[in-house]
Amino acid sequence: MTRPIRPGAARLAAFCALVVTTVGCATGGPGPATPPEHPLNHRIWDARSGQFVSQEQFLDAAAGADHVLLGEVHVNPYHHAAQESVLAALVARGRRPAVVFEMMERDQQPGIDALRAARRPTADELAEATGFSDSGWDWPLYRPLVALALEHELPILAGNAPIDETRALVKDGVDSIEPERWRTLGLDRPLAPAAQVALVDIMVQSHCGHAPGDYAERLVEAQRLRDATMAEVMLGAAPAPTVLITGSGHARRDFGVPLYLEEWAPDARLLTLRLVEVDPGAIDPADYRDTIVGLPRPFDYLWFTPALERPDPCE
């Protein structure tokens, strides 16, 4: 389902039409749970100024950043369409970012590089070579992004920590990770107490309240390992700018990937975006800020989209 590559302005217009009319059939999945007439849908909120901005204003800001983090709800096709439009617009503005994917693990990078050195692969060929297409991620949602990066010969970087590494960390704790690597990633230094409490709560909720003993703490350590690894990969792309395709939790400034980017590259210009599913009962952007008391603002921008209806995994 690779879509043709179009210039940034045309792609933005096509995106606006697409998200209003066809997203339900684009994936074969459920349609939007919130109607397209929600007053926030497809609007962008600058959380720094407290003002709505146009897509062009947002894209101009993104083009001026060294690292752009696009935080998604993984299963929402509106979010992937928005990410694609942002990447296309950056290319149209003369930027050539490395595209870093949370969905690919760092030990897959040699396979990506070898395949691209041998020929110009299709997105499906790259997915097959890396195992992306049968990894549990919804490959059709990510195919257009990978195809766009390949079409423009942008670097494609596997950003995440290897699954064997994170599984061992959750099972056996930090002793499973080589001490020097743990220190190099800055993981020997604790999070701010408010961030630690928030992350533990997120992990407990994500496991439907079942996280006995120190299990939630080990899940937090695995989350931090993923965040630090993605930051390391992004900085390793220098001098190229980067775009990170990731879940919104990893894109947070208060405890996600930006925390490590700012520590290791304090002069780098970051832009963090949360793609937000609207709530029918919340029409004020302030209702979506998700700020934790005592911690930095989590996102620079909020881009509102319809929500998708899906079953509660805890029921």
Regions found by a protein language model. Name each.
Residues 26-65:
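N- or domain-start disorder-to-order transition segments that initiate the globular core
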Residues 50-51, 55-92:
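Zymogen propeptides
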Residues 2-14:
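Bacterial N-terminal signal peptides that target proteins for export
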Residues 22-24:
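C-terminal motif of bacterial Sec signal peptides marking the signal peptidase cleavage site
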